[in-house]
From Swiss-Prot:
Cross-referenced PROSITE patterns: RBFA
Name the UniProt record assigns to this protein: Ribosome-binding factor A
Organism domain of life: Bacteria
Swiss-Prot/TrEMBL keywords: Cytoplasm, Ribosome biogenesis
Organism, scientific name: Buchnera aphidicola subsp. Schizaphis graminum (strain Sg)
Entry-linked NCBIfam families: rbfA
Subunit-level organization: Monomer. Binds 30S ribosomal subunits, but not 50S ribosomal subunits or 70S ribosomes.
């Protein structure tokens, strides 16, 4: 079977959708004041551990990112409990949240390329 359609990939996609829904609708923590996007979920081979990569729409400082990640990791047990009710899996994976700053890095590279093309009058 093709690697893109294996069971762990499908479960990771379903986890991504459900975790995003839970964060947006079920977490009522007033300390989380930013919009959180779940960009990727990576599962271990035995499906017992999930790395959840999140990005934030409004990040003022690195300190804010760390605080929100700490809050999300503290709420991971609650999120896991809600996932257990939504998904029919034998094992609900342990969830650990990480910051995904690939959008900001990509935006920075794009700006640098635009500056270079303007300087050299090159069209890409």
């Amino acid at each position: 079977m093709d690697k893109l359609f294996n069971r762990s990939f499908r479960i990771a996609q379903e986890l991504q959708k459900n975790i995003a829904f839970i964060i947006q609708h079920s977490l009522k923590d007033p300390r989380i004041k930013t919009i959180i996007t779940v960009s990727e979920v990576r599962l271990s081979k035995d499906l017992s551990y999930a790395q959840v990569f999140v990005s934030f729409l409004e990040t003022n400082s690195n300190l804010t990112v760390k605080k929100v990640l700490i809050l999300l990791n503290r709420a991971s047990g609650y999120i896991r409990k809600l996932l257990c009710k939504k998904m029919n899996l034998r094992i609900i994976p342990i969830i650990v949240f990480f910051h995904d700053d690939s959008f900001f890095k990509g935006n920075k590279i794009s700006k640098l390329l635009n500056i270079l093309t303007e300087k050299n009058n090159i069209t890409l």
